């Protein structure tokens, strides 16, 4: 399958193309998001063309892609320190097995070293896209951005051209800022009272 449209869209969105062959594309990007508690999302995108997407492919690819992401975007920072790594796997398949569809449409547990695996599939025979459309609590500030990326890759001319603001991230930023201001006010009050 020709993946030129996906390559162009990844490039337009600021991703660096790491590799490309007849079966897929690998791209990376690191970006800071003030609307996501001022955190940095490091994203590795794998776009693959397969004949039939089934659980054996997803299981093998998940392990391989998470390991590749650690090599492509290494970090010396502790796991909890204002950084996240997302692995987005977008499959273009002639057919999608029902178990693979269910896997793509369900929330994924965090991978090793807090890498989030976000699979999606486009069934070329029906034109249907399958990906999880919910938002989990952990890493939730990024899900609107990941869904946007998947929509743009499965239909590069569909939907908005710019990443959406993370409403969940804005709410969390306001909550954290309010708590920080309360802590500062309490510290000043106690310091003045002696």
Regions found by a protein language model. Give the residues of each.
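N-terminal, charge-rich interaction modules
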Residues: 1-52
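Charged, structured surface patches that assemble and position nucleic-acid processing machinery
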Residues: 21, 106-159
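Short, flexible beta-strand-to-coil junctions
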Residues: 46-53, 92-96, 122-126
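Switch/connector loops and helix/strand junctions flanking conserved nucleotide-binding motifs
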Residues: 55-56, 97-102, 130-131
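Nucleic-acid nuclease catalytic cores
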Residues: 77-106
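Juxtamembrane cytosolic/matrix-side boundary and N-terminal portion
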Residues: 156-180
């Amino acid at each position: 399958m020709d993946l030129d449209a996906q390559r162009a869209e990844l490039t337009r969105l600021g991703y660096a193309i790491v590799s490309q062959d007849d079966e897929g594309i690998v791209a990376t990007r690191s970006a800071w998001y003030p609307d996501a508690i001022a955190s940095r999302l490091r994203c590795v995108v794998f776009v693959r063309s397969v004949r039939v997407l089934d659980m054996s492919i997803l299981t093998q690819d998940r392990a391989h892609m998470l390991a590749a992401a650690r090599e492509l975007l290494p970090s010396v920072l502790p796991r909890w320190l204002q950084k996240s790594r997302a692995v987005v796997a977008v499959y273009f398949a002639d057919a999608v097995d029902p178990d693979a569809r269910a896997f793509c449409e369900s929330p994924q547990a965090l991978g090793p070293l807090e890498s989030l695996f976000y699979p999606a599939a486009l069934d070329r025979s029906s034109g249907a896209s399958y990906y999880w459309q919910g938002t989990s609590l952990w890493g939730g500030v990024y899900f609107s951005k990941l869904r946007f990326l998947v929509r743009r890759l499965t239909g590069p001319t569909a939907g908005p051209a710019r990443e959406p603001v993370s409403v969940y991230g804005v709410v969390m930023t306001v909550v954290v800022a309010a708590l920080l201001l309360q802590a500062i006010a309490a510290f000043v009050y106690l310091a003045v009272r002696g």
